[in-house]
Amino acid sequence: MNLSRRDFMKTNAAVAAAAVAGLAIPVKNVEASPDKIIKWDKAPCRFCGTGCSVLVGTQNGRVVASQGDPDADVNRGLNCIKGYFLPKIMYGKDRLTSPMLRMTNGKFDKHGEFTPVSWDQAFTIMAEKFKKALKEKGPNGAGMFTSGQSTIFEGIAKSKLFKAGLRSNNIDPNARHCMASAAVAFMRTFGMDEPMGCYDDIEKADAFVLWGSNMAEMHPILWSRISDRRLSHPDVKVAVLSTFEHRSFELADLGVIFTPQSDLAIMNYIANYLIQHDAIDHDFIQKHTKFKRGETDIGYGLRETHELEKAAKNVKTAGKMHDSDFEEYKKLVAPYTLEKAHEISGVPKEQLEALAKMYADPKLNIVSFWTMGFNQHTRGVWANHLIYNIHLLTGKISKPGCGPFSLTGQPSACGTAREVGTFAHRLPADLVVTNPKHVEKAEKLWKLPKGVIQTQVGYHAVAQDRALKDKKMNVLWQMCTNNMQGGPNINQERFPGWRDEENFVIVSDPYPTVSALAADLILPTAMWVEKEGAYGNAERRTQFWYQQVKAPGESKSDVWQLVEFSKYFTTDEMWPAEVLAANPEYKGKTLYEVLFRNGQVDKFQVPTDKPGYMNDEAEHFGFYLQKGLFEEYAVFGRGHGHDLADFETYHKARGLRWPVVDGKETLWRYREGYDPYVKEGEGVAFYGYPDKKAIILAVPYEPPAEAPNAEYDLWLTTGRVLEHWHTGTMTRRVPELHRSFPNNLVWMHPLDAKKRGLRHGDKVKISSRRGEMISHLDTRGRNKVPQGLVYTTFFDAGQLANYLTLDATDPISKETDFKKCAVKVEKA
């Protein structure tokens, strides 16, 4: 399809008006007459984890247009407001185009001015700092904080560079802040990660329950599908649970506002209701589940010196699960009566009972969706377990229109962070560094000698901040994220370590973000279709795209940076002498040679039959790097329930949902007739465990790490708005998006405002025990908060909401709780 740039701008005007109003519309409703000026190709959207496919229009070496891909199953030609403005994210006036090092008089100076340097100069000082830190502080002396926005190829390269080449597992993604609890609970419940269902469930479900998920703004294309299902089928029901009222409530038949943290009590009440009313599937439970009891009083992931950690009894065994049975489970949930759930949550009894009846109805196909409200939670793993319990008790799982569905917030939090394994403890395809057999397999598939990959887990995201501050770690490379703005407790735990004289911080980014400006070295990065890439979305769908334009100036893709940087190290410098003595063929080689010129990664050449094909990495390195990385990686999962198709298939398709066996994708896992790994006659097989049974886990309600008191008398919860994505690095550089929502706000109940002598629009100071932020008050807008709670966002670099947040984490998953801390608000 072809569309002129002028006509595209007309299209955008109509689209913007509709999207700001909360609509998602297909391009065919607004497009003008076609011509042959613009070249079109497909790519997945750069933003959330939905995985919409867009058609990208290029002209004269620039991206000038985009539109929803009508051939894509996910979005069916629709885009949300952010998707329609994708071309503009790449052309901000302050785009970085050369490496920048802090220097004074031609030498590195921690307090110097950012000065352009060559890539060789940048990598030389980086290598020097890495070698020194790893030698002096051990494998965790240097590390990387990376992203669920990195491509699959970039994830493979960084995992190999750190875990194999540098022999450091000290690499963790920002997905630790958003998806770790979901991933851990998947692994603990089913023995395998990621959802069993897919987006096709939406058109087959009779009821939807949203737990801590504002899909109307955060996953608007999926919300459009739910809206269509609800509005075209009168009997379909929607329940929305949250700590405040947001736009998703507009469609809700049952809108539930609960006290922060009390979702744990509500879910235990539902489980108790199901048992008391014999609304459970006894046959399913007997055949396909087993019972465990979780450890309790496990702390809050704070520093060991914190009073809450010292008081907790089971911090060291937080993840332990004890054998149990149905009778003990029944006894443990019995205290969660309607009265107790109401008392803890503040939810009216009739609403609680109505919700329980939705799950109890055997005729109702039901899907539970959740996002950060569940995961960014000091008991996030428990919350995920508790929703699985409900679906397992009723047998409403792993079949069309029925199941628990964890939605991801980033385009490849699944495909890269989880599947590739860029967490500090993971390897590809659900393998972990602490399992010697898994390590042995990784060494074999990566053609490495035994003993190269270490079994010591690296620092998780929050621990990296603490280690840098405490000087246990001296080098940090941040890639494809903005943690100085997006991570918790900036004042006390992050900024001090970044600016410490002994530490060296590198940031790879296309723009001068808050993180970049706090770093010592900035590396300019290619964006989106300036490189060839691949993402994996929330429904296990892997999608590829080709490079379509070149990056500006000296900007390089992250995969180029990682692979080129590997040339600055030798095995003699980084690997143990005994390993090299036993394997002399590796001695004296660069990490580039052993990791990326190993006869596997470098065995493919770029296609010669594709007119206009470009691949800057292949041109530089002399081989088809992306294909080599992917095919080497894909071997990890083939035959083990993580099967991926071959490389070329993905470039032809609009994505495929794994496992892909004999060329066929899998829509519903663990169910006979849909999943090729479930044998005939098994019906359901949760084959992540040898006994093929899923775990139902008994865990209680426990209070949050911090709650309001006389001084800090309000709950604070943080999140996003429709128009902006995460820290606004891209969306705030789109003029239309910036104008539609220029600055952050603090939403407050009108009575709370009146009590403080405040009015809508007032300039206010919001303070916590950790810091403060100046903003403006909103008592009338889209978010309607209950008394006692305020809501704010983190997209605005001029208002750093994470000055306020607490760095408490789930003790099992190590995921941060951005949803609950105590603040006070006063006139500024």
UniProtKB/Swiss-Prot annotation:
Cofactor remark from the record: Binds 1 [4Fe-4S] cluster. Binds 1 molybdenum-bis(molybdopterin guanine dinucleotide) (Mo-bis-MGD) cofactor per subunit.
UniProt keyword Iron-sulfur, yes or no: yes
Keyword Phosphoprotein carried by entry: no
Protein's name according to its UniProt entry: Periplasmic nitrate reductase
UniProt: substrate binding residues: 794
Source organism of this protein record: Pasteurella multocida (strain Pm70)
PROSITE patterns: 4FE4S_MOW_BIS_MGD (PS51669), MOLYBDOPTERIN_PROK_1 (PS00551), TAT (PS51318)
GO cellular component, one term: membrane
Gene Ontology BP annotations: cellular respiration; Mo-molybdopterin cofactor biosynthetic process; nitrate assimilation
Signal peptide (residue range): 1-32
Predominant location category: periplasm
Membrane-crossing segments per the record: none
